[in-house]
């Protein structure tokens, strides 16, 4: 079995067995048919993944590896807030007629600020510090910009990354205010694991730990039977992660620079609804 599978199982079981239901409360999320989307939730789930030991993709069901990378490049590399720059339709529900999701996600990472060393956006500041100030305890990003929330079509869920170099290893902490565990948990883990691999490579570092902190980890009511089924699926060894070692500039990475070898998983036959 993979470590990622065991972490996912433990997280889901903790939510289902020890979580609190909001079925008696008014809620904002709803299903496409207009029915309120209630959840079972746990406060503050913290999971740790040692990226030097295995790539943290689950085998209990398929995580769309290439699509996950495409989205993280859309946010962190393209710094885009337009779904027309994304090769999937997962953001369409939050886009306006022009394709914009407002001043959210990639838009915030692209906003420039002035520092003693010059003007940088958030991504370029991280890249600069990893190469020039690796011992800094100030290497982080935050896209939860209060003054722009009214112009965001969706408030950021995964909103802050803190990077820390220990020895020659790059570690990262992802802070997430809210997470739909079935649809997004391993998706986000895969994305930010890949991001750490990219940043480490272009900075001359090795990958270390990825720590995922989720304030409100929840499972939606219509997802519970699917989660219970997935947790009974067979578990396979973690696949081998491959990345193009010739890429030295973060902005040169493409989806084609990443591969998984021997990725085994159980196919999920049921369609997963997404609450909006």
Regions found by a protein language model. Name each.
Residues 1-276:
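Terminal, non-catalytic protein-protein interaction segments that mediate quaternary/complex assembly
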